[in-house]
Amino acid sequence: REVRGGGEEQWLREINERELPERIDPDNGPLIRTVAIATDAGAHDLLVVVPHIIADGTTVLTLAEQWLTLAADPAAQPWTASALPPAEDLRPRRFTGDEGAARLAEQTAQDEALVGRHRPGRIEPSNPVPLEARRTRLLHRELDGAQLEQLQRRAREHGTTVHGALTAALAIAAGHDHQRRPSHIAIGSPIDFRDELEPPVRPDEVGTYVATVPVVLDIARPFWEVARALTDDLGERRRQGHHFNLVTLVASAAPRCMADARPFMAFMEAEGPINLCSSNIGRYPFPERIGALRLSDAQFLTGISVNGYFVAAINSSHGRLFWNFTYIDEAVPGERAERLAKDCLGTLLSAIHAPQRSALEEQ
């Protein structure tokens, strides 16, 4: 599809008015859509839309890069890839069979005890919206180069990561938004497991190679302590293979049809721990030039599945960080979503610009 005219935010309108509301039919296809936008200012935007069942954030950015490479030079070296088995068939052996089932059961018991102990807050819908009527909408935010450098520097100083800081800000904002004002918030954080598969999967190979694990954060603690706790917890979950346990759950217990899926979706709706999510793929090395094309940014965002209400999709490229918030309209009204995004960004900027405190002062 081609769109001509409009200002520099025409891409946002296309996403909110067309691309997010119009689902991709996985049974009949096509499985990929593109929109080429030529703005009044002479700039061009390329939207690449792929369903999450076959692509994650890294995959869709890779596809966009390949698309532009072919557009700039149709005679370019052809891209080839092997036909890979499903991700669950590439799991390390210790996460399959009886051992894999035992690992999943152990993690499930641990997480149930954690949730029972802390009663963490979730994103509670302002209005009930039936699954069939749900529509995702987008709020775009970003950090400029100076803010990104400051964030990276302060994260290192406090012994955490950029992802830890971004996720802490989102969890704290969600706590402010919650009527109960809980001391703990449950938030999902995806883990990319391409490198751990057998054999490993390259970033340019199409597929979904992430699994979202739940983390419970004590948001009553100082900001940088929350960020470190996220980093530590996520690192430990990766070491224990919790992301593969989730793949085991999906492979062994996922419903085979919509009728069978209803009870599972109802459970996730009522009690699922990851209806708030922070998905960060980090720095994506998108080129600044492809042939005669000069590129200014590359970013991704996500529509929301049946178990989510508010999601932050994050990556950096071309010296900036892109923070795309998506939410379920009406369940999270627009004004509420704007407040959440504003609080999230404000919390982060306050933390990275605050005077440096010693570790002793933080305790």
At which residue positions do the language-model features occur?
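Gly/Ser/Thr-rich phosphate-binding loops and adjoining beta-strand/alpha-helix segments
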Residues: 28-47, 127-195, 320-324
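Acyl-thioester-dependent condensation/acyltransferase catalytic cores
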Residues: 1-58, 62-65, 69-73, 139
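Acyl-thioester-dependent acyl-group transfer interface
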Residues: 8-32, 175-363
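Acyl-group handling in specialized metabolite and lipid biosynthesis
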Residues: 1-14, 49-55, 91-103, 129-146, ...
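Short, charge-rich amphipathic segments
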Residues: 1-3, 82-95, 100-105, 154-169, ...
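Non-catalytic, low-complexity flexible loops and terminal extensions
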Residues: 10, 54, 58, 62, ...
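Structural preference for long, well-ordered alpha-helical segments in enzyme cores
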Residues: 15-16, 46-50, 59-71, 147-155, ...
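Short amphipathic alpha-helical segments, especially helix-boundary/capping motifs
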Residues: 8, 40-41, 124-130, 144-148, ...
